Amino acid sequence: MKKRKIVSLVLATVLGASMVLGGCGSNGGSDATNTEGTNTEGTNTEGASGKSSGKITIFQQKTEIYDQLKELAVDYEKETGVEVEVWQISGDDYYQNLKTYMSSESGPTVFSLSSSTEIAEMSAYLEDLSDLSFLDKINDDLIAKSDDKTVGVPMTAEGFGLVYNKNLISEDQINTTDALVQTIKDAAADGETGLGLSQEAFFLIGQILNTPFALQDDPAQFCQDVYDGKVNIADVEEFQELGKIFEAIKENQKNPLEVSYDDNCGDFATGKTEMIHQGNWCYSLFSSYDVDFDMGIAPLPIAGNKSIAVGVPSVWCVNTDASDSDKQLGKDFLNWLYTSETGADYLTNKFGFIPVVDGMEADNLDPLSQAVSDAIAEGNIIPWTFNEEWPAGIITTYLVQNAEEYFSSDMTTDEFLKALNDSFVTAVNE
């Protein structure tokens, strides 16, 4: 797979201190309904094909902000007089549903995309957003581009690593691979889980496998070398150290294939698990628990790594097939969202987003989002290579099967790493 040169959605380590996401509450939607609960499929055709609808329709995949987005719609109409209809999502196929709407000329005015692959596939539907008033206050590496046009505005930044309970362990107990492995073993001896993974594809293998790729001097070239058979990840130090961590989990803990995301986060919130490999988005689940301990996000310490993985989970886009007046309404909405006092309050406080606009401050970030913000400000970040360099669909189609086989059989760690390598070679040639 050759890297797509026309698409840029890279969070590089050049993020400045002024820059502060899901992941992963980003479930898709097989159903789309308006704010009144009626089905909107086919109801927005007057907003496509060049005819004005006179209102803004929004469709996006972050389910955790749906209710707040409906509240925002009410406030936006009060301030501007423009109606906003928020389409509901449920299920796990938001992107396919979006493509169906677009191809049938019933697409929303404003929508979200979550990877360079999606941006490339949907490029024909993406309006040029270069004239938005606030773009010069966002780091250029956060902005989605296609054919040198600005086509996507970042919602937020998100980061993942070792989410750990500061009351149970200190960061110096997990700052090297050997120390982390020993901590996992010690926790097992005490009847606790040291490092929790869960059965979902991204949380079982996708995100944790990002780190050894991101630590390479040139991740894009490294991936290409893997695809070309010049490198086998089983022979590379960073992957071998990750293998040691997987082996410690396999030998000392409950099988992660038997653990759901909710259970994994719940066990951490109740002190049964010392660490989970997760991101700042998981903090929202802790509101259901009486969490009374300090927590933070530490780097996955393979090969001396001191950085957490930070990236852009989703970007806002405007439908170029909408009428000229509706496209302007969509742009006006984004300008308001990122420059008005009300919009900033929703982004930082009600959505809980880490701000990406220079000068936009968040006074009430939760501890995990604050840890991500601090890492960005300090420059201690590595990119999300799975969004840019990996073959589309490899995590859910291939890598999760490798991990499931590893945790459910007598497959050795070396065999596991070689199987992962083979999956990359196979997926890129499909």
Where do the protein language model's features map onto the residues?
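C-terminal capping/gating helix-and-loop segments adjacent to ligand/active sites or protein-protein/ligand interfaces
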Residues: 145, 349-356, 371-429
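Extracytoplasmic/periplasmic solute-binding protein
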Residues: 151-155, 160, 181-231, 273
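Extracytoplasmic "Venus flytrap"/periplasmic binding protein-like
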Residues: 75-138, 151, 166-175, 274-275, ...
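Conserved N-terminal structural module of periplasmic/extracytoplasmic solute-binding proteins
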Residues: 9, 24-118, 304, 325, ...
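A structural signal for short loop-to-beta-strand junctions that line the ligand-binding cleft
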Residues: 101, 108-109, 133-167, 193-197, ...
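Extracytoplasmic/periplasmic substrate-recognition and gating elements
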Residues: 57, 74, 79, 288-350
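Hinge/lid segment of periplasmic solute-binding proteins
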Residues: 114-161, 172, 179-182, 189-190, ...
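Glycine-centered hinge/linker elements that transmit conformational signals in sensory
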Residues: 227-258
